[in-house]
């Protein structure tokens, strides 16, 4: 039997008699329901109503909060390019080196390395040094030392030997010779080279080949001749001293 009726389009419910309350209490005890359990009053709906959201009854703020559109946009961009690129890496340490007392300070090193490259602290308190060879793909053991600074200097020496002047070192290593001494040595080398050039003399051949009469009488005092090594100037007096005579047939005859 239906306990409701309609008035002016509104659906109303009949009052429940006291006898029915007794039956309701018995039914609640039968199904194990507590009398002190709270009751939820459900409203009546029209027949054309298909669904009802029960969460709206318990929501304290029925109006949903508007989302931050800027944050959603930033998150979507960060998913594509990466958070480190968009927001920056907060834990990143600047790679700029600051020199303090001749020591290069770069990125933060853990305490077990003593703040130096290629240095590690052993469990018994000493410091070990080793360097990686990129060409051979191996590690070179440099030994153990009493202090971290000694181990770091051993690493620097090995790095300079393996990688030359472009090696990254813990300490600022000066050149082998000061600039003044190196410049003086370079000047001495240049002077020695110039002296050697001055000492070089052109070797003159004693035998001269004459090819024409004009070559003989072009100059009264000198004979211009051409040799394999270059132009050679010879004097007529030198020919007389050597005991040679000139012949019109352009040959050289020795005196008898």
Curated annotation (Swiss-Prot):
The keyword Protein biosynthesis does not apply. Pfam families: AP2. Signal peptide: none annotated. One of its GO terms (biological process) is ethylene-activated signaling pathway. Keywords: Activator, DNA-binding, Ethylene signaling pathway, Nucleus, Transcription, Transcription regulation. The keyword Transcription regulation applies. Its main location: nucleus. GO terms for cellular component: nucleus. It is found in: Nucleus. Residues 115-172 bind DNA. GO terms for molecular function: DNA binding; DNA-binding transcription factor activity. It comes from the Eukaryota. Probably acts as a transcriptional activator. Binds to the GCC-box pathogenesis-related promoter element. May be involved in the regulation of gene expression by stress factors and by components of stress signal transduction pathways. Belongs to the AP2/ERF transcription factor family. ERF subfamily. This is Ethylene-responsive transcription factor ERF084. It comes from Arabidopsis thaliana.
């Amino acid at each position: 039997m239906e306990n409701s009726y309609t008035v002016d389009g509104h659906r109303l419910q009949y009052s429940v008699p006291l006898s029915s309350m007794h039956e309701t209490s018995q039914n609640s005890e039968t199904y194990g329901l507590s009398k002190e359990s709270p009751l939820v009053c459900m409203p009546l709906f029209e027949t054309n109503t298909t669904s009802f959201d029960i969460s709206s009854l318990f929501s304290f703020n029925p109006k949903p909060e508007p989302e931050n559109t800027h944050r959603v946009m930033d998150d979507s961009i960060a998913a594509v390019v990466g958070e480190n690129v968009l927001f920056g890496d907060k834990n990143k340490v600047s790679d700029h080196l600051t020199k303090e007392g001749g020591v290069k300070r770069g990125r933060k090193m853990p305490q077990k390395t003593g703040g130096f490259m290629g240095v590690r602290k052993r469990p018994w308190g000493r410091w070990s040094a080793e360097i990686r060879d990129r060409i051979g793909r191996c590690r070179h053991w440099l030994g153990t030392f009493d202090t971290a600074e000694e181990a770091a200097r051993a690493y620097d020496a090995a790095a300079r030997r393996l990688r030359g002047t472009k090696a990254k070192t813990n300490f600022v290593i000066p050149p082998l010779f000061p600039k003044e001494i190196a410049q003086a040595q370079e000047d001495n080398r240049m002077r020695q080279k110039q002296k050697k050039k001055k000492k070089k003399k052109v070797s003159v051949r004693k035998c001269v080949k004459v090819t024409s009469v004009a070559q003989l009488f072009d100059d009264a005092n000198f004979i211009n001749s051409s040799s394999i090594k270059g132009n050679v100037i010879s004097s007529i007096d030198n020919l007389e001293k050597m005991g040679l005579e000139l012949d019109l047939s352009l040959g050289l005859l020795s005196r008898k």
